[in-house]
Amino acid sequence: VIGGVECNINEHGFLALLYSRRFQCGGTLINEEWVLTAAHCDMRNMYIYLGVHNVSVQYDDEQRRYPKKKYFCLSSRNYNQWDKDIMLIRLNRPVRNSAHIAPLSLPSNPPSVGSVCRVMGWGTITSPQETLPDVPHCANINILDYEVCRAAYPELPVTRRTLCAGILEGGKDSCNGDSGGPLICNGQFQGIAYWGADTCAQPREPGLYTKVFDYTDWIQSIISGNTDATCPQ
């Protein structure tokens, strides 16, 4: 996260670290057995840490898990094509809630343009050169009109299952390593970080976030055992 500050140790109990030999992505614990992240964060030999604040300090209640099963939203038969950048991971066993671990519930209504949102992660705090912090950083950004992102990135599809969020004048943004992590607006989990410009936090080049609200039915169906649930078109 660019332009942020160290997150309060008590505000990110749902934030997961996804590793495969090294730190790759963030994720969000949505109940004791499930983590939501971005599809492009999928990797082999993944393991997931919860309850971490400083990566160089071991916490008593830190818990490590593996994916038992991964669910994707594939919109076509081309399995290499992530049209919808969302992945739901069932953990190999549930985590216990503790001082530093608590899930974040799914949103009950969609966010509105202008909402103030908190983005968080262990991604780089400088750009384009990368500096990975030991602690997660948090910043407040705004939901912007989707047309701001379409103007910045003309190749974007017209689809609205994506949130455009940032600061118009630049200076605060998610960045490399924050992918898969949450965007929280008015206390609700509204977005999953997935894409932005090569240099982060530039004016008029906001970040893109998968719109969690549009996928809540799909997520809840899978969690309740209907693993053939279809994604929103």
Curated annotation (Swiss-Prot):
EC number: 3.4.21.-
Cross-referenced PROSITE patterns: TRYPSIN_DOM, TRYPSIN_HIS, TRYPSIN_SER
Keywords of this entry: Disulfide bond, Glycoprotein, Hemostasis impairing toxin, Hydrolase, Protease, Secreted, Serine protease, Toxin
Gene3D superfamilies: Trypsin-like serine proteases
Cellular compartments annotated: Secreted
Gene Ontology terms: biological process: proteolysis
UniProt subunit comment: Monomer.
Family that this chain belongs to: Belongs to the peptidase S1 family. Snake venom subfamily.
Described purpose of this protein according to its UniProt entry: Snake venom serine protease that may act in the hemostasis system of the prey.
Name the UniProt record assigns to this protein: Snake venom serine protease ussurase
Gene source species: Gloydius ussuriensis (Ussuri mamushi)
